[in-house]
């Protein structure tokens, strides 16, 4: 297992050195716009997740998809009692989390400040929003990611 930035660097290396674009390591086609670096980079770092004061999980079960990340989330929860919110019920993550609706409209409502957790995100100093692979499988993935990028400039610094 490797992070997306390393995978992308390897892909770029092979394309430039041996002129090969015949690379595929995913079992399913996922929407990943590699023109936007933040689409494939885990910005906070795995260690950085321990600084988060609010974590929102979208389309992911880190207990099975990213066990090291999940252990860092758990460590942060146990130490700081942070709030963790998941769009959809993903089962036992080994720490408590609030479940909210699992649909694209919910994401839009959060960004448009029409959802109850919008205010929590605004008040948070170090929020982390973690997208999982299941979001990238959706036909609406480009739309969902565009919503996030549209909202970035309005995020207070």
What would you call each of these model-derived segments?
Residues 1-3, 132-137:
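Conserved short loop/turn motifs at secondary-structure junctions
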């Amino acid at each position: 297992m490797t992070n997306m930035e390393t995978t992308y660097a390897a892909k770029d290396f092979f394309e430039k050195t041996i002129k090969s674009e015949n690379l595929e390591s995913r079992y399913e086609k996922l929407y990943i716009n590699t023109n936007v670096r933040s689409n494939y980079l885990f910005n906070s770092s795995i260690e950085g997740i321990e600084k988060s004061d609010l974590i929102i999980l979208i389309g992911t079960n880190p207990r099975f998809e990213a066990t090291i990340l999940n252990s860092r989330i758990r460590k942060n929860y146990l130490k700081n009692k942070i709030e963790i919110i998941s769009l959809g019920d993903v089962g036992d993550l080994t720490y408590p989390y609030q479940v909210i609706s699992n649909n694209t409209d919910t994401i839009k409502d959060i960004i448009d400040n029409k959802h109850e957790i919008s205010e929590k995100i605004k008040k948070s100093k170090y929020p982390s929003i973690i997208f999982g692979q299941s979001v990238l499988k959706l036909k609406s993935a480009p739309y969902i990611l565009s919503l996030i990028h549209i909202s970035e400039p309005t995020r207070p610094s």
